[in-house]
Design a protein with these regions (language model features):
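N-terminal export signals
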Residues: 1-29
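General N-terminal targeting signals
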Residues: 20, 25-26, 59, 113, ...
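C-terminal segment of N-terminal export signals and the immediately downstream linker at the start
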Residues: 22-59, 63
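Intrinsically disordered, low-complexity boundary segments flanking structured domains
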Residues: 28-29, 83-84, 271-275
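Flexible, charged surface loops at secondary-structure boundaries
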Residues: 31-37, 86-93
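Long, low-hydrophobicity ectodomains and other hydrophilic envelope-associated domains
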Residues: 45, 64-79, 89-291
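Well-ordered, non-membrane alpha-helical segments in soluble/globular domains
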Residues: 50, 80-82
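Short amphipathic alpha-helical segments and helix-helix/interface helices
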Residues: 53, 57, 84-88, 108-112
Length: 291
């Protein structure tokens, strides 16, 4: 099965916030620095700010990065966009990790584009009232090196919630390189045929069920990924709080050192056999970018 990346993009844009934002018109980074010398956490006034920030700080502690700067817009980004413009001017050369609600994200995107920001990743995150899949995450990233989905999957697997994570990489040139993949206990991993290879990691679902959950038809053209090309993501501490896990994953990708996969896109689907009560409905957007 040759998966058209444009079809995957449609799935990403159907995720909620990315539909509202549209495909970013600003510049995606071509070769961003692997390690951030200066990292800034921007809290856009969303109700998830505190939990997201906790996850970011844990990730910084694990890699012994103690230079994190935190900026917050009280009352939300829409109440004072001028402050954001000033922050962009004052933080040239910094790597930004940002979180905000959907409405603020549209304003943030335009102001960042005008400031010449180079985007590494943008993600839409949601908890919904759906027993089959209450936690849903979609990402656009410059390349597999900026992917955060594998880290998030490793953090969520023991949280007792079913989830789906979809990532698309604008630079998918690594798909034709030496095969590399991610692995975790309980996941079965597959690779699609074709030049725009996709990796699919399923836990608690068959390949057919995983494809159906993602809106992919049929299982033809998928082959199991051999274990000898796979590496396990090391996550030292789990968290029952999914928003904190998103903050951790986003920061881990921003700080570098994650496991890239040789693919143009990838997805993680997990079905919890003893799910917890459904989390409250929430939606927010995350960004990683260089100014």
């Amino acid at each position: 099965m040759d998966i058209d990346r444009r079809n995957l993009m449609k799935g990403l844009l159907a995720g909620g916030a990315l539909l509202a934002l549209g495909t970013p018109s600003w510049t995606f980074a071509d070769e961003p620095a692997k390690k951030a010398k200066r990292c800034l956490l921007f809290l856009g006034g969303a109700n998830v700010d505190g939990r997201f920030a906790n996850g970011v700080r844990v990730a910084c502690q694990e890699v012994k990065y103690d230079g994190l700067e935190t900026m917050k817009v009280n009352g939300g980004l829409l109440s004072d966009p001028g402050k954001l413009v000033s922050l962009f001017e004052q933080s040239k050369g910094a790597r930004w990790i940002a979180v905000m609600d959907d409405a603020s994200a549209a304003v943030f995107q335009e102001l960042a584009r005008t400031a010449g920001a180079r985007l590494l990743s943008v993600g839409a995150h949601a908890s919904v009232k759906d027993d089959a899949c209450p936690l849903r995450h979609t990402w656009l990233a410059a390349s597999p090196a900026q992917g955060a989905g594998a880290v998030l999957a490793s953090r969520l697997i023991d949280a007792g919630e079913s989830f789906s994570i979809i990532e698309s990489f604008l630079d998918g040139s690594s798909a034709a390189s030496k095969p590399t993949s991610w692995s975790a206990p309980g996941f079965a991993s597959y690779r699609s045929s074709g030049s725009d290879a996709m990796h699919l990691h399923c836990s608690g679902l068959s390949l057919l069920e995983g494809c159906a959950q993602l809106g992919l038809t049929g299982v033809e053209g998928w082959t199991p990924i051999p274990s000898h090309v796979s590496q396990r993501e090391v996550v030292s501490r789990q968290s029952p709080q999914w928003v904190e896990s998103v903050g951790y994953a986003v920061a881990a990708s921003a700080l570098g050192g994650r496991i890239p996969e040789s693919c143009s896109s990838r997805a993680f689907v997990h079905r919890a056999f003893t799910p917890h009560s459904l989390p409250p409905t929430q939606r927010f957007v995350s960004f990683v970018m260089d100014i």
